[in-house]
Amino acid sequence: MRYLSLALIALVACGGATNTGDDGPPADAAPDAPGPGCWGLSPRTAAPETFVGPTGLQQRMTSLIDGAQQTLDVQMYLFTVTALADRIIAAKNRGVAVRVILDPDHAGNDTVRTKLVGASVPTRNAPTLYSFSHAKYLVIDGKAAVIMSMNFNVDAMSSERNYGMITRDPDDVADTQAIFDMDWAAGGGEAPKPADLACTRLVVSPNNAKQRLTDFIKSAKTKLDVEAMYIAEDGVRAAIVDAKKRGVDVRVILETSSDNTEVRTLFTANGIPVKGAGSFYLHAKLLVADGVAFVGSENFSITALTKNRELGAFVFEPTPAAVIQQQFETDWAASN
């Protein structure tokens, strides 16, 4: 399988350690792997493409769906944009093997679920293994995986700040496909084949996200930027404060919500500059440490990191990571 290059050993610690922090995951919270596993950070066969929402997001998603030729798998927490549902139906009608997994508890999915089922698109509710199926990703033709913080809802297409990536690396795609296949089987009452995530680049809840994201923050040597809807998990909060204490240049942008009053006070008291999001709604879950970015669906809460189905990944290639860093700089300048 994949192994760490020497350069990347210095970037992050191996993820085989036992979970630590304010509270560990429940015993049944890791159905798809025994533990965090190794960091599968050998160089990708090709650098991923990164993108930022909302500008051009619906057009990008439309193009990706329309480009599917053989298979299209979609797992989405919230799906309300009927125009994208229409493109999925069109893909099915032109012979693409389409499957869609939706969170069963979000009432916002009802209209699109009915539309897809009515058009004979195979559609299942996510399994009850998780508190929420909060992941947002696509697998296209077994050749590309789209991993992101965006839902397929109207606000994501028009007014939310989000980040995503498209990876065509075979290992990334295979791991994402395995996660989908497991949840598809479990959602249909079939015996799921556990996804083999013993060595993966992906950040997956419930099995490795808490450890990996905390370790990633701890790996920061000179610079750490955070742009998040909220930060509620104690281990993540502590790791950010500790980064500041060891001399890392830390900046944080938070959504302007009362939910963030406590963490804003904590960070400010420890000398961390914190700004409220500008003209957009901040739905992102972004970390950038020393030029390496994390993008994905994981909010920084104990439920998201240990009990939900979530999916994210690291972008350690300079060119696509720079796209994300530049957007953070723009948002920092526009926030207050």
Explain the meaning of each model-derived region.
Residues 1-38:
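Ser/Thr-rich, Pro/Gly/Ala-heavy low-complexity intrinsically disordered linkers and tails
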Residues 326-335:
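Short, low-complexity, Pro/Ser/Thr/Gly-rich segments in the mature regions of secreted, periplasmic
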